[in-house]
């Protein structure tokens, strides 16, 4: 019979039991379930709710179960309803009536809320470490390419010259915001629901401050109804993970473009690419395509959580069992994608020559041509029109701004002199963009200094 079977006269239907069970996915929280139970048993003994002897035996038994699960000596019972019931049943099997005292003044409602917070707190730390590693890998790559000129794009059209370092540092800024969001989520979720009971607390004189402290929380949750029914932290984490995946997907999309024959800006290491079953010439960026695809999956996990919670009255409802598969899936996929993209970035080859050649085409120095006139006193809109007219002239004659004869410039305005060619060279265009956050080597050096400080890099 189930541990909750007192008011029932029949065994639960086998099909219903399988449908109701969550052990298949919540077993991964066994360490956190046992960690929470050890703190709870400690508090029960300290408060005199159970004897110190029983408290010690319960803690001893829980540690034995933890060791046996870690070593593989003990396996999860697939027929158990959930990880909480499995651990309690195993404790009772080993220690008899003493094990039955563990659940005093506790409900599975506050127990599962505790387990999930403990588990996700650890997972956030792991995701944070991976995001940090990815940011570091981007910084290290950027440091090697402060002089590597490439086209900057708007609308996927060549727009203005930048450097590869400048481009990569844009992603570092995204990841820094991701780190901040992870920290904010971890801080907000670091309150302890244990002691909330089923929904209305308990009649026992428990010490919620003690269990919160033992488990590393900042404080107990202030309201018992909220303690068992809150899943904001899951939704907030899924939202943060979705933004991380959006950043990974944008990076992946660019890698997909850059390693195509149409761009050839980079080449993936053979260990991080795949081939075709029929086309022998193919070298496919499957990793980045999968990251792009998995982004949709993580977005779906966020929507699952939002939709699941939107119509639930207070307090706990069985619908909330579905929170775990969604948030576990989101965490697992973000970690998997980060673990894969980091070595891919670290091993890819950058084709500097192709990047510069692409920057030399497409009139990406047209703005600098206009700025040349502005610096000589012409209003920007007039200079803009002249530069656009010169671009049209170049296109009609198959020329570039660098190869257009000086007399053609001077037909437009005598402000053009021989020095225009230096002013519109790619290197000058990049070096001249000295504004804070820009692509000039000086501005990039300052950006590198700032992000390395934030990432605590030497």
Where are each of the predicted segments found?
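Charged, flexible cofactor/metal-binding loops and thiol motifs
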Residues: 121, 128, 143, 151, ...
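A helix-coil-helix interface module used to build multimeric assemblies
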Residues: 1-201, 206-212, 274-275, 286, ...
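Short runs of predominantly hydrophobic/aromatic residues within well-ordered alpha helices
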Residues: 37, 84, 88, 234-237, ...
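Short, well-ordered beta-strand elements within core beta-sheets of diverse protein domains
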Residues: 40-50, 119, 166, 235-243, ...
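Generic, well-ordered alpha-helical scaffold segments in large soluble proteins
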Residues: 40, 61, 65-68, 90, ...
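Glycine-rich cofactor/substrate-binding loops
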Residues: 1-36, 97-98, 279-458
């Amino acid at each position: 019979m189930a541990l909750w079977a007192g008011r029932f006269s029949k065994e639960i239907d086998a099909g219903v039991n399988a449908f109701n069970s969550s052990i298949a996915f919540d077993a991964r929280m066994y360490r956190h379930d046992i960690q929470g139970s050890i703190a709870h048993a400690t508090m029960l003994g300290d408060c005199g709710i159970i004897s110190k002897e029983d408290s010690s035996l319960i803690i001893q038994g829980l540690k034995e179960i933890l060791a046996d699960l870690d070593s593989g000596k003990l396996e999860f019972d697939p027929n158990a309803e959930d990880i909480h019931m499995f651990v309690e049943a195993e404790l009772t099997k080993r220690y008899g009536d003493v094990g039955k005292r563990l659940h005093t003044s506790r409900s599975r409602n506050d127990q599962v809320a505790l387990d999930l917070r403990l588990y996700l707190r650890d997972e956030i730390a792991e995701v944070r470490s991976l995001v940090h590693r990815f940011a570091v890998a981007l910084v290290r790559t950027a440091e090697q390419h402060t002089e590597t000129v490439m086209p900057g794009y708007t609308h996927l059209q060549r727009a203005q010259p930048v450097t590869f370092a400048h481009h990569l540092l844009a992603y570092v800024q995204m990841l820094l915001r991701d780190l901040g969001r992870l920290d904010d989520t971890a801080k907000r979720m670091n309150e302890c629901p244990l002691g909330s009971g089923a929904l209305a607390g308990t009649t026992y004189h428990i010490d919620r401050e003690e269990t919160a402290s033992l488990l590393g929380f900042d404080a107990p949750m202030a309201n018992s109804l909220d303690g068992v029914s809150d899943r904001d932290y899951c939704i907030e984490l899924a939202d943060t993970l979705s933004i991380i995946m959006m950043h990974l997907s944008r990076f992946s999309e660019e890698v997909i473009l850059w390693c195509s024959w149409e761009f050839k800006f980079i080449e993936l290491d053979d260990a991080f690419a795949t081939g075709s079953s029929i086309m022998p010439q193919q070298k496919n960026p499957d990793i980045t395509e999968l990251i792009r695809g998995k982004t949709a999956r993580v977005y779906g996990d966020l929507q699952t959580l939002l939709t699941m919670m939107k119509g639930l009255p207070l307090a706990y409802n069985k619908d909330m069992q579905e929170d775990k598969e969604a948030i576990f899936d989101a965490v697992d996929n973000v970690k998997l994608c980060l673990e894969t993209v980091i070595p891919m970035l670290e091993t890819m080859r950058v084709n500097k020559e192709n990047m510069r050649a692409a920057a030399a085409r497409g009139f990406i120095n047209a703005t600098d041509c206009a700025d040349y006139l502005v610096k000589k006193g012409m209003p920007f809109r007039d200079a803009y029109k002249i530069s656009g007219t010169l671009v049209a002239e170049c296109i009609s004659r198959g020329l570039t701004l660098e190869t257009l004869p000086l007399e053609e410039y001077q037909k437009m305005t005598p402000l053009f002199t021989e020095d225009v060619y230096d002013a519109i060279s790619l290197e000058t265009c990049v070096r001249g963009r000295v504004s804070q956050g820009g692509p000039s080597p000086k501005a990039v050096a300052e950006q590198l200094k700032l992000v390395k400080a934030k990432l605590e890099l030497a």
